[in-house]
């Protein structure tokens, strides 16, 4: 499996594109990035306001047979993403609104939507 980055000018949602790539059997692991989203969404189907100039991306990969429970990813993912952001913003303190929002100086900088998808009897996590 080779990790691939898929770049788009505009998509409905980066998660939607990742789901399509998985279900169409085109890719099992990768990252979808876009400059804009026309129908971004948050948890519980809430509308996500997608302002041009922000970063929109989804990472997807297959889960092994003995993967942790889905809700454990909700705890791990914000910490991993926070650590990645800190590589670029070393002097900023990131705070959390569990389970899926990250803030710097009280301003929301990131919302995390994770979805579990099954295709051809395999489970995939999209973040």
Regions found by a protein language model. Give the residues of each.
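Active-site beta-strand termini and strand-to-loop segments that position acidic
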Residues: 50, 104-105
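Surface-exposed, flexible loop/turn segments at secondary-structure boundaries
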Residues: 13, 102, 120
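Glycine- and Gly-Pro-enriched alpha-helical subdomains that act as flexible
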Residues: 96-98, 103-104, 113
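Short, intrinsically disordered, charge-balanced linker/junction segments flanking boundaries
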Residues: 125-127
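Catalytic/RNA-binding core of pseudouridine synthases
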Residues: 107, 118-123
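N-terminal lobe of the biotin/lipoate ligase/transferase fold
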Residues: 1-90, 110, 117
């Amino acid at each position: 499996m080779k990790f691939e980055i898929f770049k788009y000018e505009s998509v409905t949602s980066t998660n939607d594109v990742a789901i399509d790539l998985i279900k169409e059997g085109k890719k099992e692991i990768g990252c979808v990035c876009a400059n804009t989203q026309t129908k971004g969404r948050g948890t519980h189907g809430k509308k996500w306001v997608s302002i041009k100039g922000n970063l929109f991306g989804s990472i997807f990969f297959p889960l092994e047979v003995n993967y942790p429970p889905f809700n454990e990813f909700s705890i791990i993912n914000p910490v991993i993403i926070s650590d990645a952001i800190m590589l670029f913003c070393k002097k900023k303190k990131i705070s959390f609104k569990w389970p899926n929002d990250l803030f710097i100086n009280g301003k929301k900088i990131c919302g995390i939507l994770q979805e579990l998808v099954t295709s051809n009897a395999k489970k995939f996590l999209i973040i």
